[in-house]
């Protein structure tokens, strides 16, 4: 069983989802926020929010956050226990399609530099997407693939507030489902990860989210 101590976290994306999570988690843990826009990285390293959010602005200015920002995803992910993926997934209503290409770019880089890391998708994704990734990457011959999903329930400009006072916390992990139609997914999951370890990782991540809350709530770890 993997031991999660002295946890280091990387967050891919500094939009309202990624930056609010990075701010929340950096109250108690070292967090590296990764973005591709130099101006956003520079602002964050100067304790200035690149997005409009009163609570993020206040926390960056007044709280002793253990938060740094970088353009170098490779280095950030190589040193992380958890990689939170908050890359944009733009939705096309005409095609009824989420563009998940940026999510998979992050996954590919994490697998290249740190396959032991536990990845947590916070981006908005289609139903069944997480399990489909287990099949996709198992077919690619990947030997380790540790992926969780934790949906966000945030409002723009109120993202950190909603993380500090959440209505619920959900962290999903893959489960072996005893039905014939899930046989391919089950085989893929077994081939690339330790489900028991991921269940513990899901519980650990839920605890990390709870540590910085201003409102204590019950959490829910479930399968995806």
How should these model regions be labeled?
Residues 1-224:
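Structural/interface elements that position substrates and couple domains in central-metabolism enzymes
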């Amino acid at each position: 069983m993997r031991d999660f101590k002295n946890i280091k976290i990387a967050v891919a994306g500094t939009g309202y989802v990624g930056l609010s999570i990075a701010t929340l988690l950096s109250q108690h843990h070292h967090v590296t926020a990764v973005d591709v826009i130099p101006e956003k990285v520079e602002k964050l390293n100067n304790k200035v929010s690149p997005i409009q959010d009163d609570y993020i602005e206040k926390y960056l200015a007044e709280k002793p956050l253990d938060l740094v920002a970088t353009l170098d995803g490779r280095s950030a992910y190589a040193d992380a226990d958890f990689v939170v993926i908050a890359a944009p997934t733009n939705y096309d209503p005409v095609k009824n399609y989420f563009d998940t290409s940026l999510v998979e770019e992050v996954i590919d880089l994490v697998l290249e530099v740190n396959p032991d890391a536990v990845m947590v998708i916070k981006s908005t994704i289609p139903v069944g997407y997480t399990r489909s990734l287990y099949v996709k990457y198992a077919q690619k011959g990947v030997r380790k693939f540790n992926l969780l999903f934790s949906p966000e329930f945030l409002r723009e400009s109120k993202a950190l507030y909603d993380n500090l006072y959440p209505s619920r916390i959900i962290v999903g992990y893959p489960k072996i489902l005893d039905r014939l139609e899930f046989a391919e997914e089950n085989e893929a999951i077994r081939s690339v990860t330790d489900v028991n370890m991921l269940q513990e990782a899901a519980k650990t991540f839920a605890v990390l989210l709870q540590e910085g809350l201003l409102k204590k709530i019950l959490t829910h770890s479930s399968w995806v």
